Each structure stands twice: as structure tokens, then as C-alpha cells.
Amino acid sequence: MPSLDVVSVVDMQAMDNAVNNAKRDLGNRYDFKNAKYELVLNRKDKKIEIVAEDEFKLKAIIETLIQQCVRFKLDSKCLDVADAHTVSLGAAKTEIKIKDGLTKETASKITKFIKSTKLKLDSAIQGEQIRITGKQIDDLQEIMQLLNGQDFDVPLQYVNMKR
């Protein structure tokens, strides 16, 4: 029986490249000359910490980071931007969490959606992935299209497609 796995994985090397390119782009911008800012990727905790002189610069850093993520084919849905808060002397700070893996809530939403499509498919949650099996490969391809059309707040990838 044909099957495939639905996962949500972020390539941390591509994220590291996006952060480094964002730093390089910000260094070349005129409005960031002599500006103090920090953009740090913490691979272990899967988060990005940003500190800037003010909220305007903080928003510009976030926009530049998102542009670089798109350039490296990382979906911006994997970034969970927290609200900015003020630290000493008017500097603004925020933390961006990188969503990696499917949570139980998201996985259950996806399986409910699959069941609601009335396609002859079985889905099972296996840790941080969902295994979908069906009698025809066409049904699997159709569910891939339908899942891409939905918004589950995480980027979805399809792996291990077997005939």
C-alpha cells in the first residue's frame, strides 16, 4: 500500500546561513551604520535572540531575517516572533522561536482534516510525524495538494513516499 510521512523540519544549517546573511545585509545598510544591534542564533534551544537600539531597527532586523529565510527556501511559518520589550536605555529586545516538529495539537488537526476529506486514507500520528496510507497513489498526491492549501501554522514537508 502506498504511504507517505508528513513532517515539519527546519534545516538548521540553512537557518544559520540566513542569520549570517541577514547580519551581512544589516552591516551594509546606511541606517545601521554605527548602530548597535545583536542577532544571535542558538541552535541548541532553536531560537534567535535580537537586541536593537530601538523598535524601528528591531522591526527592520526581523524583516531582513524573514527575507533571508525566504531566500534560503525556509518557510516564514517556522518563525514564532515574540512581542518586543524594552530593556535598558530604550533598547528593544525580542526572541524568535524556531518551530521544529509537529506538536500533538497540530498533528491531531491534520489527521482530523484528512478524515474530513472523505478520501480513502488512513492516518496515524507517530511522534512528530504523521503516516498516511492509502490504496492509490493518486489519493496521496491529492491529500498533499489539500494539505498545502490549508494553514496549520507550521511548514509541512512530505517524506518517505512509497508505492
Swiss-Prot record:
* GO (cellular component) term, any one: cytosol
Alphabetized UniProt keyword annotations: Nucleotide-binding
List the coiled-coil residues.
Answer: none
Q: CDD domains recorded for this chain?
A: YajQ_like (cd11740)
Question: By its UniProt entry, which Pfam families does this protein fall under?
Answer: DUF520
A Gene Ontology molecular function term of the record: nucleotide binding
Per the record, the similarity remark reads: Belongs to the YajQ family.
Q: What does this protein do?
A: Nucleotide-binding protein.
What is the protein name stated in its UniProt record? Nucleotide-binding protein DET1318
State the organism of origin. Dehalococcoides mccartyi (strain ATCC BAA-2266 / KCTC 15142 / 195)
